[in-house]
């Protein structure tokens, strides 16, 4: 029997990394990048093409994006990561099939609409509801930017971009302006 090749530190470290990733639940259509982001994409049946669904901070968000895209493509017949979750709302009254951009937009909004907390973070609330409407195709970039900016905050259901980013919020409170003695105490 020939002698076995010497063990390489590169092989053992790559196997170690693969083992560490297994502590997270695996989801369909989701993989972890080497720098820690979770990415999602879906294959279109019978064509072999892929639709990029984005990169996310948590595997659950990437899995929800995949579920939304799967629902757009296969309807109720798909095998979902979260089968009991409410499905995304598709645009009403559309006679044309959904485009790649439509599917990406629906997936991004759906992934950001409910935040699932991993089982190892039990001190936080289980879900956070954020309104998710599918924007018109001309407002996709603006809507995506707002969704990304307010994704981690609790918002009232009637919040708008204007009320979230108002000029009044950038001014100091009136009690700070009147009580300046505390500044003199610092000096």
UniProtKB/Swiss-Prot annotation:
Disulfide bond positions: none
The subcellular localization recorded is: Nucleus
> From which source organism is this entry?
Arabidopsis thaliana (Mouse-ear cress)
Keywords of the record, alphabetical order, are:
Activator, DNA-binding, Nucleus, Transcription, Transcription regulation
Q: Does the keyword DNA damage apply?
A: no
Task: Write out the similarity annotation.
Answer: Belongs to the AP2/ERF transcription factor family. ERF subfamily.
Indicate yes or no for the key word DNA-binding: yes
What is the recorded name of this protein?
A: Ethylene-responsive transcription factor ERF015
One GO location term (cellular component): nucleus
């Amino acid at each position: 029997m020939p002698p076995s090749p010497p063990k390489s530190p590169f092989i053992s470290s790559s196997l170690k990394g693969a083992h560490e990733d297994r502590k997270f639940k695996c989801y369909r259509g989701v993989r972890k990048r080497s720098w820690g982001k979770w990415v999602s994409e879906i294959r279109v049946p019978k064509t072999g093409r892929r639709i990029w669904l984005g990169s996310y901070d948590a595997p659950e968000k990437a899995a929800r994006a995949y579920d939304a895209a799967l629902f757009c493509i296969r309807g109720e017949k798909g095998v979902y990561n979260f089968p009991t979750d409410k499905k995304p709302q598709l645009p009403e009254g559309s006679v044309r099939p959904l485009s790649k951009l439509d599917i990406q937009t629906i997936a991004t909004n759906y992934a950001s609409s409910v935040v699932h907390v991993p089982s190892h973070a039990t001190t936080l609330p289980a879900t956070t509801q954020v309104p998710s409407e599918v924007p018109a195709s001309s407002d996709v970039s603006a809507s995506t930017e707002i969704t990304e900016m307010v994704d981690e905050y609790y918002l009232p259901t009637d919040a708008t971009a204007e009320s979230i980013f108002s000029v009044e919020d950038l001014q100091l409170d009136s009690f700070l302006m009147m009580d300046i003695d505390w500044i003199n105490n610092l000096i």
